[in-house]
């Protein structure tokens, strides 16, 4: 195993908070493999790169010689995590949870080493608890303490309903750590309350309390809101190689470094060198391409990563003009100096009519020189652009 200092440096990379870092150091000093737990409720069929922030950290623990427990919350998934919610979540059926759980297993082993991973389901122990056991578990915490949670506090004072089963969720998640005898538990910053519950319950059951590591919530493609399928700003683990590559090229330049730290396995010294190169004038797209190739290769293989940039849209994002792109010369007879993007799309036959132009612009599917534009974008007379409308229509356009 690496030294404690080397291990700690990798473990702390990108971490938001470690609760009882001294305890982690003591555990590492024993020189024995630790049991590292992270739980995922299978509430949707596919994972996105935001989920992989935790999974990447699990892989780093594996590389340091530790045992990872990838916990699928099939039982808690049917309760519904109330964290950050302003209303009670609708419960999932057993069939939904089982189907989603299967896809999770298929996706996570693109990152985790199967030989160092225990895949567990919390129904293994929760289904065996009697009503009396659940009441005893509920007796370990008070309603007053539960209402200290920010989301519960807001709902209570906003006179919005809170179901009793939602109070049980953090207790069940905490009990998972008891059942698994976890040494370390990982979670997002929004999970801190639930993670602390695990420490409290382990102490109650005379176990050494787990160390808690919280990881940041990854921003989505807009660089502002958290990555979320419902917000449409996500990169799915199962996205096609070209689509994944293109989305990664489209992130804001300043967000690239956050993605490198949380999603890349490159050494931080190398990433710092990339920053120096960009500050010295290197095109950020060239560095972003390295990030995109690494992540696409992780999920689709090296060959797919090498060819992913060859789609026309991705080449434009990289500042390249794809082969065999039609060239369109637009000669305007009036004295206008600028033209709406909707007008240019129609004139260049990239759309059939004004309604089609409105539709494709409304869907955010128009790109000028690789950058997404909205309906207000104007094209200047005398300019030259590569314009893409939707997935298939693209042209190099000269406006005279």
Curated annotation (Swiss-Prot):
One Pfam family here: tRNA-synt_1b
S-S pairs: none
Protein's job: Catalyzes the attachment of tyrosine to tRNA(Tyr) in a two-step reaction: tyrosine is first activated by ATP to form Tyr-AMP and then transferred to the acceptor end of tRNA(Tyr).
InterPro entries: aa-tRNA-synth_I_CS, aa-tRNA-synth_Ic, Rossmann-like_a/b/a_fold, S4_RNA-bd_sf, Tyr-tRNA-ligase, Tyr-tRNA-ligase_bac-type, Tyr-tRNA-ligase_bac_2
The protein's name in its UniProt record: Tyrosine--tRNA ligase
Catalytic activity: tRNA(Tyr) + L-tyrosine + ATP = L-tyrosyl-tRNA(Tyr) + AMP + diphosphate + H(+)
Listed GO CC annotations: cytosol
CDD domains (UniProt xref): TyrRS_core
Record-stated family: Belongs to the class-I aminoacyl-tRNA synthetase family. TyrS type 2 subfamily.
Segment forming the signal sequence: none
Organism superkingdom: Bacteria
Domain spans labelled S4 RNA-binding: 339-399
GO terms of molecular function: ATP binding; RNA binding; tyrosine-tRNA ligase activity
């Amino acid at each position: 195993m690496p030294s404690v200092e080397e291990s700690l440096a990798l473990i702390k990379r990108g971490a938001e908070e470690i609760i009882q870092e001294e305890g982690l150091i003591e555990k590492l000093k024993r020189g024995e493999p630790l049991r590292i737990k992270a739980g995922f409720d299978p509430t949707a069929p596919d994972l996105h790169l935001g989920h992989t922030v935790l999974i990447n950290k699990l892989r780093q623990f594996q590389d340091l010689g530790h045992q990872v427990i990838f916990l699928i919350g099939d039982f808690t998934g049917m309760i519904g995590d109330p964290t950050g919610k302003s209303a009670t979540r609708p419960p999932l059926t057993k069939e939904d949870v089982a189907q989603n759980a299967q896809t999770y297993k298929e996706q996570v082993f693109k990152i985790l080493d199967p030989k160092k991973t225990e895949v567990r389901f919390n129904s293994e122990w929760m289904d065996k608890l009697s009503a009396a056991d659940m009441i005893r578990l509920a007796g370990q915490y008070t309603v007053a303490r539960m209402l200290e949670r920010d989301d519960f506090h807001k709902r209570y004072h906003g006179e919005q309903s809170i179901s009793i089963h939602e109070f049980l969720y953090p207790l069940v998640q905490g009990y998972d750590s008891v059942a698994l005898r976890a040494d370390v538990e990982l979670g997002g910053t929004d999970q801190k309350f639930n993670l602390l519950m695990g420490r409290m319950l382990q102490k109650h059951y005379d176990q050494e309390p787990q160390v808690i590591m919280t990881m940041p919530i990854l921003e989505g493609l807009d660089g502002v809101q958290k990555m979320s399928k419902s917000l449409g700003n996500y990169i799915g683990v199962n996205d096609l190689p070209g689509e994944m590559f293109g989305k990664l090229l489209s992130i804001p330049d300043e967000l690239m470094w956050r993605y490198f730290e949380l999603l890349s396995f490159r050494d931080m010294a190398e990433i710092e060198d990339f920053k120096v190169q960009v500050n010295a004038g290197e095109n950020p797209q060239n560095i972003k391409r390295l990030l995109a190739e690494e992540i696409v290769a992780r999920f689709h293989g090296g060959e797919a990563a090498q060819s992913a940039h060859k789609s026309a849209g991705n080449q434009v994002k990289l500042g390249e003009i794809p082969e065999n792109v039609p060239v369109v010369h637009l000669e305007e007879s009036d004295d206008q100096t600028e033209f709406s993007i909707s007008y240019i799309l129609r004139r260049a036959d990239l759309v059939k009519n004004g309604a089609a132009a409105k539709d494709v612009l409304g869907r955010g599917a128009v790109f000028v020189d690789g950058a997404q534009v909205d309906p207000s974008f104007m094209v200047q007379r005398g300019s030259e652009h590569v314009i893409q409308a939707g997935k298939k229509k693209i042209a190099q356009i000269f406006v005279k």
